[in-house]
Amino acid sequence: MRHRNGLRKLNRTSSHRLAMFRNLTNSLLEHEIIKTTLPKAKELRRVVEPVITLGKNPSLAGKRLAFDRLRNRDNVIKIFSELGPRYQNRNGGYIRILKCGFRRGDNAPMAIVELLDRPEAGIISNDSAD
């Protein structure tokens, strides 16, 4: 019986799935917003949130665990210097998944995954216009 086995296999081998979620996690942490399919986005939440939670308590063991899961030194530094303090008062729920229609080629449901409380990009201030 398959009781409480909630892992989505996504038609991939375990090594391919691990590499795919590692790449998606690194992209999300680097750009703070990505577009992917809805099942990948829902499964990505289970990978990203524990990694960000590691950044809330800066320790050497936590940094080693984060590097083991990400294999990207720049993103590990970002987790512990930026994201950990940003989400210090939030107990989980660090990402937002928004449905954004269907992919043109195969009609797969798409989603936008973004980190909450991210700084707004592309806003031009009019302070120096005078």
Curated annotation (Swiss-Prot):
GO terms for cellular component: cytosolic large ribosomal subunit. The keyword Ribosomal protein applies. It comes from the Bacteria. Pfam families: Ribosomal_L17. GO terms for molecular function: structural constituent of ribosome. NCBIfam families: L17 (TIGR00059). This is Large ribosomal subunit protein bL17. It comes from Nitrosomonas europaea (strain ATCC 19718 / CIP 103999 / KCTC 2705 / NBRC 14298). The gene is rplQ.
